Every structure is written in C-alpha cells, then in structure tokens.
C-alpha cells in the first residue's frame, strides 16, 4: 500500500468515525507485518515522503490534533523498531499526547478502543523503563522519594486522558468515553502504586464511582482489577471490612489461569482475614505458595502466642517480603489486639469451671499467661488490667474488671463475652456512594 493509499484509508476512517478501520491502520507493534511494510514504504518512497507533510495537512489539518497525531505516528513507525527503549518511549509519548487531544473532542468517544490499547502499551513501557533504568544518587526529590521520570510523566499524561473522560457530560450515547473509564483508572492506580501515591488512587476511584459509569460496559478483567485496587486502598485506610469484600470479589472472579493476579489478591485478602480473626485454608495457601509467609502467623494468632507471632513477623526474609508488599505495619498494628484477645480466651477456657455462677478468670492466671506468651517477666498486674480494659473498650471482650481482686468478669452467654472478631470490627466510614454504585450495577 502506498503512502497516499494509507493516508486516504486513514482519512476515510476519521471522517466516518470508523474505529475498526482505524485499529487496522494504527499498528504499534514493530513485529507486525503491516507495521514493517509501512516502515519500509516510508523509507523507500522518498518522493512521497517529501510531499507527506503537505498531504497530511490537506487530509487532517481541518480537525484539531489529527495532523499532529498522524505525523507523530509516522515518526513512531519510522524509528521505533531501530531505536532504544528510551527513544521508543519518547516517540510513543508524543503519539499518546496527540491521541489524547483527539480523544478530548466532544465527539471523540469513537476512539475509546484505540485509546485503551495505546494507554496500556504506554504504561507498560513506562513501567519497564522505570524498572530497568538505574537509580542515580541525585535522583531524589525534596521529600526523599525516588524521582521516577517515566512513571511520573506517564501518570500525568494518562491523568489527562482520565480527565477528558470525566468531563464528558453526554448521556445515553454509544459509544461513550466512559467506556474507557475503568481501563484508564486501573492504569492510573498501577502508576500511582509504583509512585507510592496511594491517596491519588483514592481520588481516582472516588471520581469513577461518582461519574455514574455503567459497570455493565466494563469487561470483567477491568472490574476485577478496579476492585482489587479499591480493596488495596481500603486496606491502606484500615477499612478492613470493605477491603475484604472487594479483594474477595477480585480473587473469586479472576480466572484460574491468571495465577499471578489471583495470588496478589489472595495476599491482601489474607491480611484482611487475619485482622478479622479468619484465615484461608491450608490448601489455598499451598496452591498459591503463601504457606511460608502466612502459616506461622496464623498458627500464632489462633493460639495467642505473642512471642511466636512477633518472631515470625520479624523474621528477616519474611519481614522484607511483607514490607515490599506494604502489609508489614498493618499486620504489626492490627494483629496485636487479636493475639491478646485469643490468649485471654484460651486462659479462660482452660481455667473455667461449670460451678462458677458468673464466668470469670483470675488476673493472676492472665499475668502468668502474658509473661509466658511474650517471654517477658516485666509484665505486672497493672499491665494485664490495662490490656483487659483496652480489649473491653474495643469490644473484643464483653465484661468488666474488679480491680480489688484483679478479676476479669465475663458476660454470661454462650460465647462468654468473646464474640466473633469479625462482628466486632467496626465498618469504618462506610461509603454509601460506593455501596450504592456496586449494588445498582449488580
């Protein structure tokens, strides 16, 4: 196909808003035969190349952004295959910026499919370069964070695309710019997590929920990914119930062949479950190679073995593994109270006698258990009473302390005041808009 024929086909696609034809024209993979053929034509057709700018101006100059888009696409085709990744990224970024301009037109919704495809490639290459580019000594910002040029630039450009989607107020049209909202939101979350700017993810997610986007227009893969990141953000905010619900959906709906993605969901789902007094089955942990990471913690939590839990969490390799995934502090902070609750329950059940009119446990037993479980003899009765008061105040134990006799008196019911942990954890700052968004689109 000559350059003139290619440009005519491309011009017709733009004029007719034919996304299928445009998809066939805009090829980004240098290994594709059509890409190679166009690249060869650009190289060989010197006469056509000299007239190229004039032809592009004639065919595409009437619509803002399209002349620049076609020009940068030809630059990409001509140079991408022979350029290093850094140069290829620059070419792709120029192309993406102009594509976003075209997409921002009031009637740009027909470009949704190609915008999603180019966005994915752009973000993928940005992340690859971020990983492969060595960190320089002076590449830190004023706050001490690593400056990530490729990811930072990508996040700004993809955010521009996202804002274009949000600003589209047209209702009940097909296609709609909002057809791309979940894909673009997920890419932004991926970039923001790499940048450790999780609060920006929360802003993106809130905008998606308030946008009135139709979940039925999203693919299951997009929805699974969106709820995975939503669960991660809720876990970051210590909203454990909400995090568990989204991560459970993400894990269950993710296809079995997507092993890595299911494993990621299970890592954070398991973290939520431990805080809620639950745990996955051994078989599930084994299947996703998480036994070494979580089984020692689960065993210690169930038995109230505080020393073993701390040693397991502080194990050098395990600690690094948890820190890398951003759950170390969450486990350290939220599991401590569960350990004390389970330890005191274990002591009560071991010492309880049916002859007791009111269930209770002596503080001396609790003190002995505290010293043994922590391997710390510095604990005294005041410490034990403070722990009991904290457990009662947070609802983990229903009862009261008799200070004079150092006795923990428990509620007279089948659970003896030790209610199911999940029912005690508060649903912090329940977001009704979020709940209604997923319920309305169920």
UniProtKB/Swiss-Prot annotation:
GO terms for molecular function: double-stranded DNA binding; RNA binding. Keywords: Cytoplasm, Nucleus. Residues 224-415 form the PCI domain. PROSITE patterns: PCI (PS50250). The keyword Ribonucleoprotein does not apply. One of its GO terms (cellular component) is transcription export complex 2. The keyword Cytoplasm applies. This is PCI domain-containing protein C1105.07c.
């Amino acid at each position: 196909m000559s350059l003139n024929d290619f440009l005519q086909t491309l011009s017709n696609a733009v004029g007719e808003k034919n996304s299928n034809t445009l998809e066939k024209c805009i090829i980004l993979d240098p290994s594709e035969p059509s890409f190679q053929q166009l690249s060869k034509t650009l190289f060989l057709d010197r006469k056509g190349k000299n007239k190229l700018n004039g032809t592009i101006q004639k065919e595409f100059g009437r619509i803002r952004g399209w002349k620049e888009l076609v020009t940068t696409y030809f630059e990409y085709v001509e140079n991408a295959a022979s350029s290093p990744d850094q140069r290829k990224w620059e070419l792709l970024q120029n192309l993406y910026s102009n594509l976003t301009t075209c997409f921002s037109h009031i009637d740009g919704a027909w470009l949704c499919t190609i915008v999603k495809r180019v966005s994915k490639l752009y973000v993928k290459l940005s992340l690859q370069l971020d990983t492969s580019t060595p960190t320089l000594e002076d590449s830190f910002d004023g706050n001490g964070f690593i400056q990530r040029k490729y990811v930072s630039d990508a996040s700004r450009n993809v955010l521009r695309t996202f804002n274009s989607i949000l600003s589209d107020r047209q209702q009940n049209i097909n296609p709609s710019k909002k057809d791309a909202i979940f894909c673009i939101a997920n890419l932004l979350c991926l970039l923001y997590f790499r940048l450790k700017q999780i609060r920006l993810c929360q802003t993106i997610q809130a905008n998606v929920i308030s946008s009135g986007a139709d979940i039925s227009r999203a693919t299951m893969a997009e929805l699974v990914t969106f709820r995975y990141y939503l669960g991660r953000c809720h876990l970051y905010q210590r909203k454990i119930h909400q995090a568990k619900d989204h991560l459970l959906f993400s894990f269950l709906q993710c296809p079995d062949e997507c092993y890595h993605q299911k494993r990621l969901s299970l890592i954070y789902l398991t973290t939520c479950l431990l805080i809620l007094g639950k745990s996955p089955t051994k078989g599930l942990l084994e299947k996703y190679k998480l036994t070494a990471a979580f089984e020692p913690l689960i065993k210690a939590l169930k038995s109230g073995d505080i020393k073993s839990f701390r040693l397991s969490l502080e194990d050098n390799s395990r600690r690094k593994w948890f820190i890398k995934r951003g759950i170390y502090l969450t486990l350290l902070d939220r599991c401590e109270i569960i350990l004390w609750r389970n330890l005191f329950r274990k002591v009560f059940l071991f010492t309880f006698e049916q002859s007791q009119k009111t269930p209770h446990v002596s503080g001396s037993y609790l003190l002995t258990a505290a010293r043994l479980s922590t391997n710390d003899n510095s604990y005294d009765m005041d410490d034990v009473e403070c722990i009991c008061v904290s457990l009662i105040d947070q609802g983990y134990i229903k009862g009261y302390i008799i200070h004079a006799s150092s006795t923990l008196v428990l509620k007279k019911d089948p659970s003896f005041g030790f209610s199911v942990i999940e029912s005690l954890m508060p649903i912090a700052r329940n977001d009704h808009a979020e709940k209604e968004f997923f319920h309305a689109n169920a």
